[in-house]
């Protein structure tokens, strides 16, 4: 029930805020279903890999698919400082950000966190 509104969200967010030249979402090659159980976390990383001739990821979009509440598991973005995105813990919520932004998922302290990740690609940045 969330996937089509999520795709609309991705397209609208890119058009209104980022303006990146993207390949059609119908050519998506990578969706990732993430399951974070109690005690798991994902350390700091970026999704875009500089100077990679194959990957041209520009935007990362995440959709929270959890149907039950969980504790911990905050998404944290790092630009000039850490930004904790606790609003993303609400089921059905979505977030989109440039794939070159460093981010992590804090440790789940109870419950299970389920998300869908879409990486949107386009021609290389100039």
Please provide the spans of the model-predicted regions.
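Fe(II)/2-oxoglutarate oxygenase catalytic core
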Residues: 1-94, 100-126
């Amino acid at each position: 029930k969330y996937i089509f509104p999520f795709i609309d969200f991705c397209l609208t967010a890119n058009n209104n805020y980022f303006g990146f030249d993207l390949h059609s979402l119908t050519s998506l090659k990578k969706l990732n279903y993430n399951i974070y159980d109690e005690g798991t976390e994902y350390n700091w990383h970026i999704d875009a890999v500089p100077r990679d001739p194959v990957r041209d990821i520009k935007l990362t979009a995440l959709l929270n698919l959890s149907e039950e509440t969980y504790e911990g598991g905050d998404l944290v973005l790092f630009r000039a400082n850490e930004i904790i995105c606790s609003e993303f813990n609400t089921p059905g919520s979505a977030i989109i950000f440039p794939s070159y932004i460093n981010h992590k998922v804090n440790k789940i302290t109870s419950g299970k966190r389920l998300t869908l990740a879409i990486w949107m690609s386009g021609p290389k940045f100039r």
